[in-house]
């Protein structure tokens, strides 16, 4: 299956929800104010967000749609153009390119978003692109997390740096970076605990890990990725706000898009925060993390069902 086919299949539920919803609303050849308001309300209910939905409504109202043409298809095209203008600047295809120098990526996210699995899939892409990879098992609060990351390291051929459950996460990160330096390994992916007892502990732990990383290399971490679960809908906006208070988020990966009609939340979060999008999780297989491509996303999200 090609990449675009994966995008289309992954966004099938979201695209069907959008196209069928628009068909129900648009029953007249002319788009009047009542129809515009219904379109805006529908987009908001589809997790596209208030700001983006309002802008899309304004664009539709300014464009004169030919009554002879299919109004739903025309509005779908307006939506596609809006997505492209918004999201092309947020592509980060360079993230996966082979690096000559040390590149440390701190990976964050709440429990259950598929963070450790995502690290494994990133590692697979890095390896396929010719990079040597280290996984740093800094979620030391759960023995299962260490075991899971070790399993992924075996699958993709990455080196794993780990310690006993309950060990200091920052010390594991330090050892991983030192090992990378000593062995000329360019890519270090650091897994972190999804959730601690309270926000202060989470903030302190993240700050400690980040500070230790910076002591080993003043330019690190080069990236701080937040993994988000698309099925959480608008809740992911709160997650981004909270994690960004702890440490500046430089990229997003959204998982579980194949199992939800809430793909519109990616538009909402892009409009509000302009954080680059690294990749999209469109399935459970090792190759189902797709490098974000705005055109493929726009095509898949607005495919007419």
Task: Walk through the language-model features, giving the residues of each.
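Charged, compositionally biased N-terminal leader segments and the immediate start
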Residues: 1-27
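Electropositive phosphate-/nucleotide-binding environments in soluble metabolic enzymes
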Residues: 12, 33, 50, 54, ...
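Alpha-solenoid HEAT/Armadillo repeat architecture
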Residues: 12, 44, 65, 214, ...
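Primarily NTPase-proximal linker/entry elements flanking Walker-type ATP/GTP-binding cores
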Residues: 17-138, 145-165, 171-181, 185-190
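G-domain G4 guanine-recognition motif of GTPases
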Residues: 27-28, 45, 49, 111, ...
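Conserved catalytic-core segment of NTP-binding enzymes
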Residues: 148, 169-183, 198-303
